[in-house]
Regions:
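Carbohydrate-binding surfaces of carbohydrate-active enzymes
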Residues: 1-189, 194-203, 222-223
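Short, charged beta-turn/beta-strand-edge "cap" motif at the junction between a beta-strand
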Residues: 205-209
Length: 225
């Protein structure tokens, strides 16, 4: 929703985050709960509002498009590798596109290949400022995907934080780190999607060895089993 709004900023009149935090312990549309713990929506909004994002949206004619969104002041040009993969990592098709947008603008390319096979998703990979980024997208909000929990993780103690590295053997949806009294800690990221063969490192600040002993790594498949 946020990415669609950004791609249509000339006609959408902007995006309002209606409620930042809960005012009592309850379930609402706020992105931070009553105890000041960020919800999944908080982390997704952080990703969706990055200064430079390549993602997928549908236009008014319901045509699926690859879109580059730029909110900085400089013109950005990216070479995008995009396509469709199965949850176990098989690439069904793959294309390349070059997108370029001025600051505050957007650029699009129509996606004309088949994109509605079950247990599959669309991906987009690109590099900005020497850093590789990837986006994953489902045409039907993941309803036809049967996720499994097939990943490993390790924890390393660093000078000022703990590093948790998660490596996925199959697509891992919404990998989440949590501990007892989870609201006390700061996470560099959370509720992350990992493609098959991909790994990421998340950092936890403000925790002790005793806190880390309560660490649980879970995901969408486990939580909905």
């Amino acid at each position: 929703e946020a990415e669609f709004t950004r791609s249509n900023k000339g006609i959408s009149s902007g995006f309002m985050n209606w409620m930042y935090s809960d005012i009592w312990p309850s379930a609402t549309w706020a992105v931070v709960d009553y105890y000041c713990e960020p919800k999944q929506a908080y982390y997704q909004m952080k990703r969706s509002y990055a200064p430079v994002v390549v993602t997928y949206v549908q236009n008014e004619q319901k045509q699926l498009q690859l879109v580059l969104l730029v909110d900085g002041l400089q013109t950005v040009t990216v070479d995008v590798n995009y396509g469709m993969r199965t949850l176990d990592g098989k690439t069904l098709w793959q294309r390349t596109a070059t997108l370029s947008a001025e600051g505050g603008g957007a650029d699009t390319a129509d996606v004309t290949d088949e994109c509605n096979a079950p247990d599959s998703y669309l991906f987009a990979e690109y590099v900005t400022d020497g850093v590789k980024h990837d986006t994953v997208f489902s045409y039907d909000m993941w309803h036809t995907c049967k996720f499994v929990s097939d990943y490993v993780y390790k924890v390393d103690k660093l000078t000022d934080c703990y590093a948790v590295t998660v490596a996925a053997n199959q697509f891992a949806k919404g990998v989440t780190l949590k501990m007892t009294d989870n609201y006390k800690f700061t996470y560099s990221d959370n509720y992350v999607d990992l493609q098959a063969g991909e790994q990421t490192t998340l950092y936890i600040y403000g925790a002790t060895d005793d806190d880390i002993a309560t660490l649980e790594v879970t995901d969408f498949a486990k939580e909905t089993a």
